[in-house]
């Protein structure tokens, strides 16, 4: 059978969409949904008319769909949280959720900055019981930008009353996030906002924002503020919100003209984070920046006389350092020439990654797209440019650098993740395995605490390799506490042994096996030897006090 190369959506009936739906890009969202369901590219009538060659136009659209994630509109709450996770930009050292700069922490949306290995343990009182949890920390926020028009007292925010259009796009090939939005105020003054964002893959300490605004139907002074915020807290997971949410104290905060510096230290783990931010643009003079200081945050404020139809741009570079990532702590801050220069540098780094990891699927658009989505998010969570180049002592969390579910802990998921790295980036796979080797002593302590020999790796691992699984579980139906048996999932040690063997088998890295892998295998074998009991009646060994992979 001849494959379908594509389709053309000639038009929708005149009354098919309301004017509000048309403005909100609902037609584009519908066309995309049909293309994904039909597994084939669809052109609009306008795209067909503009295409000199129809077959080339179908192929161009196919390539676009296979390399991009697009979301139209805005559904606050659980749906929005999921979209933000999927639109995360990251480079293995840091991750930024796919929010726009106007968004702040709320039930509707959740901007966050995550740094690999940034954990803190805090006690919380829940239902009469004091529990301790090691959490993946939401680091200080430097992404927030807001504006107000004329003499308005309130900053424009995203709400059903103000939002007219929102389209967010993530380029999987280059790691570039773009958001285009139209907001209106109470006087129906409309302003178009375009945000571009990258986590620089070539320089893992850096992330960059470009923020452009354009008055569509008015001219007026516009006041713009960008914030360095140390008041943020963990709020990503609804069921964790009754736990201690603030994990650090601000230890230093300063601003000088277009530059801010914030330093924080986690409350228990004593890890320091420093963020240096620099705003640039030809829409303001450094001397005209107003500084507004609070106890835990600083705002830089500029006012621009904006004219209808004219675009105005501000750029922000943020340099992130973490004391537990020693090389990042020692790297000096180097200002970039522009957002465009940083984006090109990052795109070149992504190009080298895709040269090794891209798998081409013929004749199945959605399989191709899904493969790239998964590969992209793996590389955003751990990359040769960060984990390997900076020798990060971390592994990949259950939610990557995208969110706080499972408290950012490392489980046995590595058994599904490491084959990707072993195949395409073996040196990065080795660095991820060293995370386990460096915590071998904790695994041996864990085994001894349960009267076993050898090394028993924890079901949930975080900063130092101790068992971070809760011993008690709160039943949400009856409010009673009971034993949490998930701690008995011992197969994580088998997965680690398999991963070490697979790496050696695939790479023939004998030096790794001599220095690290062999010791891990031996200690894990000792654990299972001590955990197994011979049944004299059957002549077979058995294990008990375990929970299987199906939980």
Where is each model-derived feature located?
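Substrate-binding groove/exosite segments of carbohydrate-active enzymes
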Residues: 344-505
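Structural motif
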Residues: 9-13, 46-47
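Beta-strand segments within the central parallel beta-sheet cores of soluble alpha/beta enzyme folds
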Residues: 194, 223-226, 431-435, 513-522, ...
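A conserved hydrophobic secondary-structure block that centers on an alpha-helix together
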Residues: 201-202, 502-512, 516-519, 523, ...
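Short, glycine/acidic-rich hinge or "gate" loops at secondary-structure transitions
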Residues: 387-396, 448-450, 512-516, 533-543
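Conserved beta-strand/loop subsegment of P-loop NTPase cores
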Residues: 5-7
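Acidic/polar, glycine-enriched structural segments that form the non-catalytic walls/loops
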Residues: 17-25, 35-406
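Acidic/histidine-rich catalytic neighborhood
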Residues: 523, 527-551
């Amino acid at each position: 059978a001849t494959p379908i190369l594509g389709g053309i959506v000639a038009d929708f009936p005149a009354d098919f969409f309301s004017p509000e739906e048309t403005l909100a890009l609902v037609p584009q969202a519908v066309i995309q949904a049909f293309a994904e369901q039909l597994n084939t590219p669809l052109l609009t009538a306008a795209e067909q008319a503009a295409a000199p060659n129809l077959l080339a136009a179908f192929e161009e659209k196919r390539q676009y769909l296979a390399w991009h994630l697009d979301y139209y509109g805005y559904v606050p709450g659980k749906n929005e949280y999921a979209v933000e996770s999927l639109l995360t930009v990251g480079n293995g050292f840091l991750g930024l959720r796919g929010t726009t700069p106007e968004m702040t922490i709320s039930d509707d949306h959740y901007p966050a900055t995550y740094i690999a290995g940034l954990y803190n343990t805090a006690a919380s009182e829940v239902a009469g019981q004091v529990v301790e949890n090691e959490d993946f920390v939401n680091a200080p926020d430097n992404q927030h930008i807001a504006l107000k028009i004329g003499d308005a007292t309130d900053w424009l925010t995203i709400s059903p009353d103000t939002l007219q259009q929102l389209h967010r796009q993530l380029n999987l090939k280059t790691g570039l996030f773009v958001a285009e939005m139209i907001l209106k105020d109470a006087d129906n003054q409309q302003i178009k906002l375009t945000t571009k964002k990258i986590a620089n893959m070539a320089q893992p300490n850096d992330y960059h924002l470009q923020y452009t605004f354009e008055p569509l139907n008015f001219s007026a002074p516009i006041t713009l503020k960008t914030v360095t915020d140390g008041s943020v807290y963990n709020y990503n997971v609804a069921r964790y919100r009754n736990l201690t949410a603030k994990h650090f104290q601000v230890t230093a905060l300063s601003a000088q003209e277009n530059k801010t510096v914030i330093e924080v230290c986690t409350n228990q783990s004593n890890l320091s984070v420093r963020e240096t931010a620099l705003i640039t643009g030809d829409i303001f003079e450094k001397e005209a920046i107003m500084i507004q200081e609070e106890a835990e945050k600083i705002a830089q404020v500029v006012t621009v006389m904006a004219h209808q139809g004219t675009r105005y741009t501000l750029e922000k570079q943020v340099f992130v350092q973490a004391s537990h990532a020693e090389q990042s702590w020692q790297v000096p801050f180097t200002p970039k020439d522009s957002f465009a220069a940083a984006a090109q540098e990052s795109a070149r780094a992504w190009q080298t990654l895709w040269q090794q990891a891209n798998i081409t699927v013929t004749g199945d658009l959605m399989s191709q797209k899904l493969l790239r989505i998964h590969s992209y998010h793996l590389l955003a969570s751990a990359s040769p440019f960060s984990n390997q180049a900076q020798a990060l002592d971390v592994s990949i969390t259950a939610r990557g650098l995208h969110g706080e579910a499972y408290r950012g802990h490392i489980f046995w998921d590595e058994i599904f993740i490491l084959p990707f790295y072993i195949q395409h980036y073996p040196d990065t796979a080795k660095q991820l395995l060293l995370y386990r080797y460096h915590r071998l002593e904790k695994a041996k302590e864990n085994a001894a605490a349960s009267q076993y020999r050898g090394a028993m790796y924890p079901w949930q691992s975080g900063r130092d390799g101790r068992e971070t699984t809760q011993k008690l579980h709160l039943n949400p139906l009856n409010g009673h506490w009971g034993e949490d048996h998930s701690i008995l999932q011992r197969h994580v040690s088998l997965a680690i042994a398999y991963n070490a063997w697979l790496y050696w088998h695939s790479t023939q890295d004998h030096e790794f096996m001599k220095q690290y892998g062999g010791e891990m295998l031996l200690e894990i074998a000792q654990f299972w030897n001590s955990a197994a009991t011979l049944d004299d009646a059957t002549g077979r060994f058995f294990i008990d006090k375990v929970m299987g992979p199906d939980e």
